[in-house]
Amino acid sequence: MRSDGLRLTNIFLIQTLGSVQNYSALPQPSSALKRTSSIGYQNPPFTSQHTRSMSLLNSASRPQQPNFQRSSSGGAFGADAGLSSVRRSVSSNIFHGASVGRPSYAPGSLSASSASQSLQRRSSVFSRPSVGGPMGHQSFFTQVPNAAGVPRDPRPLRDRSFQARIGQELLEYLTHNNFELEMKHSLGQNTLRSPTQKDFNYIFQFLYHRIDPGYRFQKSMDAEVPPILKQLRYPFEKGITKSQIAAVGGQNWPTFLGMLHWLMQLAQMMDRFVLGEYDEACAEMGVDVSGDRIIFRFLTGAYHDWLQGGEDEDDETAEKRLVPHIESMAQEFERGNEKYMQEMQVLEAENRALRDQIEELEKNAPDMAKLDKHFRILEDDKRKFEDYNQNVQGKIEKYENRIKFLEEEIQKVEAELQAAEEERSSLQSSVDQQGITIQDIDRMNTERDRLQKSLEDTTARLEETHARVMEKEAEASRKLEDLEEIVKVYNTLGYQTSLIPSTAVNAKGQDYELSLNINDNSFSASQIGGLPNRISSEADRLLAEPFTGYHPAHLLNLDLRGMVRSSLQALRKEINERRKRAIDDDLERRNLLDNIKEAMDEKRSEVEALEHKRRAAEEEFERLKEITTTQKLASDAQIEKMEKELAKMRATLSESVQLMEQREMNTNIEYEQLTLRANALREELHTNVESMLNDVIRFKVHIQKGLEDYESFVVDEVEQELGGDLPATKDVTSQT
């Protein structure tokens, strides 16, 4: 068996259980529990809410954990590394206790290393790292830390169809896993649509027990749920408050339904992980979990069998309990290594075949330098041909566009030529039909020249007239722009003086806003006598009609000389009256201000007197401050001296307190031992007293029986001596 145990070398490394955190669901012995009342160790994270079963933890007679040692490297265990690797040694045990045998279970025997190890106890089974020690890669199930702030749930939790789907999945999961049988609580089809607080509590407890079976809910749900969600790293736990947990129905239910569905998926994932469904995915990601599974099975089985032994069990028997587990683990590792060896042989064969192919190709291949040179030449030719093709393609597009343009021009010229031919033919035919002679043609040409000259003179006069019209038009446009600017200034002043709009304070319901009644229509050539080129479109707004301008009275929308002027004069009169009243009020306020200034001067003189007193008080304050500072320095020196003495006293007191705590713990241990010894002595005394009472009773019965025999003997003797005097003898006997 020792040789089988030695075959574990170069396979795995077992760390001491003292340094391996308690990441299993197996309960720790009572000796491994920290006692915060006597030792000032702080609780590890989440242990205040994540409490294990107290029925298993309070057993005071539970033996200590085994100590599995390993070498720091992957080499052999050595000659003494067989079953001694699991020997319970005092020097390497997590409880560095007494000199020989099993270490003391007293809390005072804990060392600093065991304290740090107890602080590292796990808070739940789902967060354990690999027990195979630190690895060179990241875990396949490592979660990325959440971003700061409250994240937004991307799931459509408010969608009725989505709620129905995840609710049905959750209900099927609860039904398949015997929720009603375990929780003794019935579920209906509408439970996940309008649940009660009790339904939510039972469902949450059931789902979390699927994740961590050893957890015990000891507080209210609003106090238990937030730490659990934070510990599980629920991405949206910051959006769930205690008040919402106390009332899960109504508008809050979609949020809690999504949270319960997430817990269900987490439980399903853990079940699949336990069944090994993710092993292939882990292997694809480069994470081998088979070794972790073998070690975990070894630790759980060995720990279970080790717990079966009592406290009085010797080390040799404990080692014999672990031998089958070590052999089983060695066989599992050997089977795994055989698979890896087969894969390695296949890969080595493939590697050799590929190397042979490479060598053969290198032998048969031509000179690589020539091929590279030829390849570079071909690449250069390819680049040149591509440039040439791009150049030719550009020329092709250019010539195609030019051809299209020339074809269009040819078509236009041909159309014009055809129209001219048709016109010439029509004119020739009309001339032939009229029968015009040569004299008529000469006369018509002379008349045409005269009319042409008259047209040119008329056109010149029209140009001059048009120039004068354009000047007048430009002047009218400038005047119109000036008028528009004046109207804008008027309207601006009207807005400033609260005259515009009609709802303003000074308008009194009248509209004082000016606007120009300018025609925006553009007259066509038919309206202005068929001369579109002689009158600009910009001058259309200067005309009320095609050939008529605006009348001054019709250009503005208000009667400025009549209604507007009288209204403004009335407003000016009213404003003057208000101005006079304001001036009178201002004079009164100025008089009041003068009186206030006189009073302020008097107060200022009083303030100056008080300032003089203040300066005197400040001088007195500075003098007292210097005295106080001197006294403070002296007192600080005294305080510093007293603080040093106090620190020394505190150090002494701390040592004394530690000694007293140690003495108290030793006294408690001695008290427990004395109590046990007293109980045993009491039992022994009770047994001895009972035995003595039995002896006394037997002795009494024996004496009584002897007296009775002696009495009968005496009676017989008396009867024989006295003969028939039997009554007298009976009287004597009765008196006796």
UniProtKB/Swiss-Prot annotation:
The keyword Cell cycle applies. GO terms for cellular component: Ndc80 complex; nucleus. Residues 57-70 have a biased composition (Polar residues). Residues 109-124 have a biased composition (Low complexity). It comes from the Eukaryota. One of its GO terms (biological process) is mitotic sister chromatid biorientation. Disulfide bonds: none annotated. It is found in: Nucleus; Chromosome, Centromere, Kinetochore. Belongs to the NDC80/HEC1 family. Component of the NDC80 complex, which consists of at least ndc80, nuf2 and spc24. Acts as a component of the essential kinetochore-associated NDC80 complex, which is required for chromosome segregation and spindle checkpoint activity. This is Probable kinetochore protein ndc80. It comes from Aspergillus fumigatus (strain ATCC MYA-4609 / CBS 101355 / FGSC A1100 / Af293) (Neosartorya fumigata).
